[in-house]
Amino acid sequence: MALDIDTAALLLDQLGNQTRLRIVRLLVRAGEEGRTVGDLQRAIEIPASTLSHHLSHLRSAGLVWQERQGTVLNCFVAFKKVSELVDFLTAECCVDVPAGNVHRRAAG
């Protein structure tokens, strides 16, 4: 299902925080394996309470989900939600540019 502008804005608001963006990027890199809360805490070097706060925001937005396995809490990125956000951002790419006038500029 395509995102509406309000949902996209909420997701972008959550990703506008550097720590949350770092968490999501680490989880994207981890793929389907995810990462434990302890791994995330060591990678980002923040207190457990701060990490918990940011994970709560990401879970509420549907960008991250967690699964407990015994005493270990694993975190995973919601790939479908992230993909929907990327699709929302690029859905109308270049629609206002006349055909034949689309030029890609090198980054930098």
What are the language-model segments listed below?
Residues 42, 59-60:
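Alpha-helical residues within the helix-turn-helix
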